[in-house]
């Protein structure tokens, strides 16, 4: 999984 923070979703 990955954080939405850096993707700005």
UniProtKB/Swiss-Prot annotation:
GO biological process, one term: neuropeptide signaling pathway
Chain positions found as Phenylalanine amide: 9
Keyword Manganese belongs to the record: no
Highest taxon above the source species: Eukaryota
Main location: secreted
Disulfide bridges in this chain: none
Gene Ontology CC annotations of this record: extracellular region
Keyword Oxidoreductase: no
Alphabetic keyword roster: Amidation, Neuropeptide, Secreted
UniProt similarity note: Belongs to the FARP (FMRFamide related peptide) family.
Biological role: Cardioactive peptide.
Protein name per its UniProtKB record: FMRFamide-like neuropeptide
Organism for this UniProt entry: Callinectes sapidus (Blue crab)
